């Protein structure tokens, strides 16, 4: 709960401050009586991928949440005029950012892990003018793999590719880790019990790891 209260919001402030602004008490986080009394918790969830449809099964039981990290990369170059700064004199941070997006896809595709994924779904260019070469370009990487070891390898490879791309453009890049959740195994006996109940009802039910971090 203490860590959750200090989580930063995109527009500034913390989760605790956002709760107070909504007339909620952040000290109540993690104090649910019923949650403390529960012997086990089972979440029913619509699949957010397409593993089951390809396997031909209507339901599956999750065995674990795959490891997951989010990193922020900041590329720093030189902001200049888009019309008068010729290519040899540019240090455009959007170039290594774009190359990092491509490198992220290539890295997971070549990793050998069929569950490895890397997504850059948010970018920010500053100062953000149409006729201005950006001086700073920031992107956020979401990466998930089957194992903790593979996650480290993939992130290291993407980071190295971004550094190489930044140097080639005469820019700098720095990375910050915003979150890291190791692989989380679910209780094996409970997983087996749920699978048994489902198989007695609907037939064969596979056990799969999941890439949805909230499970």
Language model segments and positions:
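Extended hydrophobic-aromatic, low-complexity segments
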Residues: 132, 150-154, 206-208
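Conserved short beta-strand edge segments in small beta-sheet-based binding/regulatory domains
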Residues: 167-177
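Short amphipathic alpha-helices in soluble, non-transmembrane regions
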Residues: 153-163
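Short secondary-structure junction motifs
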Residues: 113-120, 170-172, 203-205
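Midchain, well-structured core segments that form catalytic/ion-binding scaffolds
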Residues: 1-149
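An extended, acidic, His-containing surface patch that forms the Zn2+-binding/catalytic region
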Residues: 176-215
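Conserved helix-loop functional segments at active or binding sites
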Residues: 103-110, 164, 200, 204
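Charged catalytic carboxylate motif
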Residues: 96, 157, 193
């Amino acid at each position: 709960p203490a860590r959750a209260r200090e989580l930063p919001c995109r527009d500034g402030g913390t989760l605790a401050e956002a709760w107070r602004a909504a007339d909620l008490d952040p000290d109540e986080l993690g104090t649910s009586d019923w949650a403390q009394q529960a012997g086990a918790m089972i979440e029913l969830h619509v699949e957010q991928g397409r593993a089951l449809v390809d396997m031909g099964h209507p339901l599956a039981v999750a065995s674990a949440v795959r490891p997951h990290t989010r990193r922020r990369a900041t590329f720093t170059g030189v902001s200049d005029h888009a019309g008068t700064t010729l290519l040899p004199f540019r240090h455009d941070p959007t170039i290594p950012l774009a190359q990092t997006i491509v490198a992220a896809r290539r890295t997971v595709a070549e990793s050998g892990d069929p569950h490895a994924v890397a997504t850059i779904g948010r970018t920010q260019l500053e100062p953000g003018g149409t006729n201005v070469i950006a001086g700073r370009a920031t992107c956020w990487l979401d990466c998930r793999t089957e194992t903790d070891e593979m996650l480290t390898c993939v992130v290291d490879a993407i980071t190295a590719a971004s550094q190489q791309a930044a140097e080639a453009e005469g820019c700098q890049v720095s990375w910050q880790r915003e979150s890291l959740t190791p692989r989380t195994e679910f209780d094996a006996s409970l997983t087996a019990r749920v699978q048994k109940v489902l198989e007695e009802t609907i037939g064969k039910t596979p056990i799969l790891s999941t890439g949805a971090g909230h499970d």
